[in-house]
């Protein structure tokens, strides 16, 4: 039962002796200055956690892999996830990929939640902000992140993320972010909007208009 990410992270943190805790995950290639620049900004900005941008790359040359990479790095695909869509200025945010933390953060607010096989970083960063912490995204540092190459792999990954979102929100006592509800609301709107418009024809025009605008935006972006 302890062979999952949050347990491994906590064991590593407890065994650490330095002033900085840095998490590096797979599917990524890190620049040579990754550690030095982030550690410098961590103390220069008096931040509690800093992180880098993602440059999302396709896993192979297939059309699907390229489409997934594009969708995973565009506002139309991932909304306001700043580290995925990119920024040009050092920016305070609600989460960063992986993270470069001050060691004393874990003494102040505790370790990663071991109930969360997925999303443990989201819960931790939300807990950090709720405790008055400061999280900063650094555009000077860019990680090459390789996206999944098939829809089935993407679906499996996002299903796991979605599965643990309610538990994260329950532990926090409030939603970690508002944007997490947009996909759900959109899908429910598609499903129930069509059903409701059958009984209220006047709503049919609004329903079709929304779908048409969405289609145009999809083609544009």
List PLM regions with ranges.
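Glycine-rich, basic loop-to-helix element that forms the pyrophosphate-binding segment
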Residues: 1-16, 37
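Conserved nucleotide-sugar donor-binding
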Residues: 17-18, 98-109
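Short aromatic/hydrophobic "clamp" motif used to bind/position activated sugar donors
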Residues: 21
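The conserved acidic donor/metal-binding loop of glycosyltransferases
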Residues: 25-29
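Conserved donor NDP-sugar-binding/catalytic core segment of glycosyltransferases
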Residues: 33-66, 70, 142
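Catalytic donor/gating beta->alpha subdomain of glycosyltransferases that bind UDP-sugars
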Residues: 42, 58, 113-176
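Short, flexible, basic/aromatic active-site loop/helix in glycosyltransferases
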Residues: 52-54, 58, 68-92, 96-98, ...
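Membrane-embedded multi-pass helical conduit in multi-pass membrane proteins
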Residues: 186-221
């Amino acid at each position: 039962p302890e062979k999952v990410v949050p347990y491994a992270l906590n064991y590593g943190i407890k065994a650490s002796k330095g002033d900085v805790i840095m998490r590096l995950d797979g599917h990524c290639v890190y620049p040579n200055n990754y550690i030095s620049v982030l550690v410098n900004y961590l103390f220069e900005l008096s931040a509690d956690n800093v992180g880098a941008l993602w440059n999302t790359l396709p896993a192979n040359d297939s059309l699907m892999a390229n489409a997934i990479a594009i969708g995973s790095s565009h506002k139309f695909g991932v909304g306001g996830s700043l580290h995925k869509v990119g920024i040009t200025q050092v920016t305070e945010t609600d989460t960063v990929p992986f993270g470069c933390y001050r060691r004393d953060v874990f003494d102040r607010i505790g370790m990663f939640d071991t109930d969360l096989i997925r999303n443990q970083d989201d819960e931790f960063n939300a807990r950090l902000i709720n405790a008055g912490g400061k999280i900063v995204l650094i555009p000077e540092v860019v990680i090459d992140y390789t996206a999944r190459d098939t829809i089935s792999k993407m679906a499996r990954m996002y299903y796991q993320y979605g599965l643990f979102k309610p538990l994260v929100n329950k532990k926090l006592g409030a939603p970690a972010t508002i944007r997490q509800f947009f996909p759900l609301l959109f899908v429910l709107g598609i499903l129930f909007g069509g059903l409701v418009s059958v009984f209220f024809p006047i709503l049919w025009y609004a329903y079709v208009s929304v779908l048409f605008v969405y289609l145009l935006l999809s083609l544009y972006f």
